[in-house]
């Protein structure tokens, strides 16, 4: 990993509890209960204000001073859970812990076990503390909490056999042939239903009619994962979930690039086809067509210099996609790199001579920005406005988290997230805002 540098800087990232924004819509009949301080509640109300007023399936249990001296949070938490049950009637409740819970050493796991027994349905703890996790790793914590509900074996079904005598059997019944257990494919990641349907359709056209997804919208219909399962991650930040699947289920986790951009989607599909012995000849034409559809946007991006400061752990796949667009990625900063799950992405970026910085130091990045003079900086929300004031054009990294960016069909939405800020800056300059001092 000679091209990966580490600077041990602080994470400039959203809090992991914000992952409820997409998870509460993915897992039906669920409720996400966040346990934290007034500051955490204010963050959720500010960041997800539209969803809060839409009466979404998440809420807050605010820690008070009396909770600091309480022997156990079970009783107080139980009162909040009862309110949730009365109003929402969920089939599963996820209790998301925050930094405050970690600092106070509150044992929510024991409380959740007691509450699961009391209410008769799963109350699952998930560690979403921002102390050692980045924004998107909240999804990893929730999926990891769901793994015990993933079956190891499919429900037994009695086969209906039609007995027919074989030729030259002389009336003797032949011995039953033992069939090898079939391998199944499971895609892992909480992406939108339309994205899943597109990927399932692509794989069906290539010869895989059945493709399961984890998480399923219904907790009672999770796919089987065992030693016969091939697991393929859709997101680069599911490390704990994948490690547990390898260790406890003995499933094969396919190491490939992520289906982000036409190039990534093509390699993703090819890796699955090769694993299952399927023909890959049709994939190249699909990729070529996707690139042709992007040509107007590619003309805007070619030759531009783009820098990632690091926020949502999508930086490496996005940087790989941009290099395929003839963009010079001057630096790909990211909070954390799990080399085992990102092996293919790292190899491609090294081949393309992209500087990769793990846990970057923001002060040093500011100095490098002055040297690079990038055309676009991809950064977290809290950093973008100050950078704009310094004369840099920025893109919000959070937009890549919420947008549909996987697969061939969504490639146009992905590339527009990069071209839109560039076009905005160009329009401002054409209207004379640069002369007024708004832009340098």
UniProtKB/Swiss-Prot annotation:
Outline what the protein does.
Component of the dark-operative protochlorophyllide reductase (DPOR) that uses Mg-ATP and reduced ferredoxin to reduce ring D of protochlorophyllide (Pchlide) to form chlorophyllide a (Chlide). This reaction is light-independent. The NB-protein (BchN-BchB) is the catalytic component of the complex.
Listed under catalytic activity are:
chlorophyllide a + oxidized 2[4Fe-4S]-[ferredoxin] + 2 ADP + 2 phosphate = protochlorophyllide a + reduced 2[4Fe-4S]-[ferredoxin] + 2 ATP + 2 H2O
Enzyme class comes to oxidoreductase
Q: Give the record's cofactor note, including how many are bound.
A: Binds 1 [4Fe-4S] cluster per heterodimer. The cluster is bound at the heterodimer interface by residues from both subunits.
| Originating gene | bchN
Q: Which HAMAP family match?
A: ChlN_BchN
Q: Any idea which UniProt keywords this protein has?
A: 4Fe-4S, ATP-binding, Bacteriochlorophyll biosynthesis, Chlorophyll biosynthesis, Iron, Iron-sulfur, Metal-binding, Nucleotide-binding, Oxidoreductase, Photosynthesis
The answer to whether UniProt assigns keyword Iron-sulfur to this entry is yes
GO molecular function terms listed in the Swiss-Prot or TrEMBL record: 4 iron, 4 sulfur cluster binding; ATP binding; metal ion binding; oxidoreductase activity, acting on iron-sulfur proteins as donors; oxidoreductase activity, acting on the CH-CH group of donors, iron-sulfur protein as acceptor
Subunit comment: Protochlorophyllide reductase is composed of three subunits; BchL, BchN and BchB. Forms a heterotetramer of two BchB and two BchN subunits.
Indicate the family of this protein: Belongs to the BchN/ChlN family.
Q: Which cofactor does it need?
A: [4Fe-4S] cluster
Question: Could you provide one GO biological process annotation from this protein's UniProt record?
Answer: photosynthesis, dark reaction
> Origin, by domain of life?
Bacteria
Annotated PANTHER family: LIGHT-INDEPENDENT PROTOCHLOROPHYLLIDE REDUCTASE SUBUNIT N (PTHR39429:SF3)
EC id: 1.3.7.7
Binding positions ([4Fe-4S] cluster): 15, 40, 99
Tell me one Pfam family matched here.
Answer: Oxidored_nitro
Q: Can you say what this protein is called? A: Light-independent protochlorophyllide reductase subunit N
Pathway membership: Porphyrin-containing compound metabolism; bacteriochlorophyll biosynthesis (light-independent)
Asked if the record carries the keyword Ribonucleoprotein, the reply is no
The organism is Heliobacterium mobile
């Amino acid at each position: 990993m000679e091209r990966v540098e580490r600077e041990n800087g602080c994470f400039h990232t959203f809090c992991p509890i914000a992952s409820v924004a997409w998870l509460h819509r993915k897992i039906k009949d669920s409720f996400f209960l966040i346990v934290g301080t007034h500051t955490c509640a204010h963050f959720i109300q500010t960041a997800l204000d539209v969803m809060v007023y839409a009466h979404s399936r998440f809420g807050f249990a605010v820690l008070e001073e009396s909770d600091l001296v309480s022997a156990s949070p079970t009783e107080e938490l139980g009162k909040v859970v009862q309110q949730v049950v009365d109003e929402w009637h969920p089939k599963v409740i996820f209790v998301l812990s925050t930094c405050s819970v970690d600092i106070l050493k509150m044992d929510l796991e024991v409380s959740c076990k007691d509450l699961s027994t009391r209410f008769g349905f799963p109350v699952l703890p998930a560690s979403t503390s921002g102390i050692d996790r980045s924004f998107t790793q909240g999804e990893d914590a929730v999926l990891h909490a769901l793994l015990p509900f993933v079956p190891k074996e499919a429900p037994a079904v009695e086969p209906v056999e039609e007995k027919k005598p074989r030729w030259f059997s002389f009336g003797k019944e032949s011995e039953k042939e033992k069939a090898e257990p079939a391998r199944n494919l499971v895609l892992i990641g909480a992406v939108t239903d339309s994205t899943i349907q597109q990927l399932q359709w692509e794989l069906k056209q290539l010869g895989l009619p059945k493709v399961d997804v984890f998480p399923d919208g219904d907790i009672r219909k999770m796919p089987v994962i065992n030693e016969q399962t091939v697991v393929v991650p859709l997101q680069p930040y599911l490390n704990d979930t994948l490690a547990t699947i390898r260790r406890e289920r003995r499933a094969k986790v396919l190491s490939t690039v992520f289906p982000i951009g036409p190039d990534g989607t093509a390699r993703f599909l090819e890796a699955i086809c090769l694993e299952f012995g399927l023909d890959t000849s049709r994939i190249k034409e699909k990729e070529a067509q996707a690139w042709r559809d992007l040509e107007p946007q590619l003309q805007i991006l070619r030759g531009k210099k783009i820098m990632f400061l690091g926020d949502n752990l999508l930086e490496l796949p996005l940087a790989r996609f941009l290099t395929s667009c003839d963009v010079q990625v001057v630096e790909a900063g990211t909070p954390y790199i799990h080399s085992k799950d990102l092996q293919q992405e790292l190899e491609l970026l090294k081949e393309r001579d992209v500087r990769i910085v793990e846990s970057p130091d923001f002060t040093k990045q500011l100095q490098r920005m002055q040297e690079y003079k990038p055309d676009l900086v991809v950064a977290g929300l809290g950093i973008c406005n100050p950078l704009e004031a310094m004369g840099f054009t920025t893109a919000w990294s959070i937009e890549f988290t919420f947008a549909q960016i996987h697969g061939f069909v969504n490639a146009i939405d992905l590339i527009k997230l990069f071209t839109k800020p560039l076009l905005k800056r160009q329009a401002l300059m054409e209207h004379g805002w640069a002369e007024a001092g708004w832009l340098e």
